[in-house]
Amino acid sequence: MCIRDRLRFSRRTQGQLNRWAARYGMKLNPKDQMYHAKNSCAGRYTAVNLTNADTVEIRLFRGTLKLNTLTATLQLVNHLCEVAVSMSDQELQDMSWFDFLDQITEPELIQYLKERRLYVNLSLIHI
């Protein structure tokens, strides 16, 4: 998925992402990526924190008090989890940002994406 679009959705600057939600780096094989993520010394300030054995923490997003932003963020993370569980490693690697968004059906998330010009598809929701 396009890093620029994920950065815009996260409401963080590149510097904030590097400090609070760093990436583990890219490995060629998803199994190597998971092993590296679980066994690295990166600490908890990574985009997906796997430090605790029974917890997965998504740290990409800035905090918010706005209900529509919170709702859209939770819906995006839910969709991300659904996609990750239902697709093969190769399908995930081949997926674009727009392929990912095409499967979204939650009207609040669609509206949020449209308002921020992250996705435009007028057939999905009628304003």
Set out the residue ranges of the language-model regions.
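Flexible helix-coil linker/hinge segments at domain or subdomain boundaries
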Residues: 8-13, 82-118
